[in-house]
């Protein structure tokens, strides 16, 4: 049955093609005037095709969002994309879990510039543990909160340097170890991406102890003074600051 429609009327059963003057279209199978079975819909803002039950998408379906230029493919439950699916955006592809058409759970996203995120999502954002590969060759492994590095993580730089420690709001924040080379590293406390407070610098057999502020050394101190300040203010980190370079390298390579 093929008809042109200006309004909704009449009972429909079986295959039907509905055409509206504004360009809307429905093609599929009806039962008691409701779409049941495979159908495709063309609307002003979106296109939709898949398995329907009583006018609602249930089963495999594909949704094209014309306003946001996105395509969703996967399994739908009561009109919502849930479980494993695919989202194709203007400059990225996402493969993973959805709840109500929103990225939730484990997934992998690849951008057109070859940057990649693989890990946990919540409410469409990186949340939890994940790995991000940057186009410049760097990669970050660790915890995320709302698309920003937050918690414990490891930043690997393209020049071979590495930072392992805590982040907040996408910046180094808290205790961290910065590996310059195999025999050179620094143990520092950070604040908003800058070294603050006590720091220990190791280069081979040479060790320096300092106090930092705004990423600059404001005072050099001896080992006894340093350890006493650690005991007074950062006692939980005392054992780490006692490690030698081999122990620190072993720790960083095992994480």
Predicted segments with their positions:
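Beta-turn initiation residues at beta-strand->coil junctions
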Residues: 17-21, 40-44, 62-67, 86-90, ...
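Conserved anchor residues at repeat-unit boundaries in beta-strand-based tandem repeats, strongest
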Residues: 1-13, 25-36, 47-58, 71-82, ...
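Proteins with a high burden of low-complexity, intrinsically disordered sequence enriched in S/T/G/P/A and R
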Residues: 1, 61, 107, 130, ...
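Long terminal segments
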Residues: 191-255
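Terminal low-complexity, poorly structured segments
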Residues: 27, 44, 234-236
């Amino acid at each position: 049955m093929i008809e042109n429609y200006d309004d909704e009327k009449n009972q429909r059963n079986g295959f039907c093609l509905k055409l509206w003057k504004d360009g809307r279209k429905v093609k599929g199978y009806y039962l008691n005037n409701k779409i049941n079975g495979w159908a495709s819909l063309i609307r002003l803002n979106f296109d939709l095709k898949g398995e329907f039950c009583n006018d609602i998408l249930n089963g495999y379906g594909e949704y094209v969002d014309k306003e946001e230029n996105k395509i969703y493919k996967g399994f739908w439950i009561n009109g919502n994309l849930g479980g494993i699916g695919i989202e194709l955006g203007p400059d990225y592809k996402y493969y993973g879990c959805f709840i109500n058409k929103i990225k939730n759970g484990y997934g992998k996203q690849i951008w057109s510039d070859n940057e990649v995120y693989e890990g946990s999502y919540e409410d469409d954002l990186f949340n939890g543990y994940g790995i991000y590969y940057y186009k410049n060759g760097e990669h970050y492994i660790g915890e995320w909160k709302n698309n920003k590095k937050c918690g414990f993580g490891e930043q690997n730089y393209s020049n071979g340097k590495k930072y392992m420690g805590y982040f907040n709001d996408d910046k180094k924040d808290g205790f961290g170890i910065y590996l310059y080379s195999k025999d050179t590293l620094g143990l520092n406390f950070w604040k908003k991406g800058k070294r603050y407070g006590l720091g220990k610098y190791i280069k081979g057999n040479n060790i320096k102890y300092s106090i930092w502020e705004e990423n600059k050394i404001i005072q050099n101190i001896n080992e006894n003074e340093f350890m006493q300040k650690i005991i007074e203010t950062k006692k939980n980190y005392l054992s780490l600051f006692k490690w030698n370079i081999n122990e620190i390298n072993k720790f960083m390579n095992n994480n």
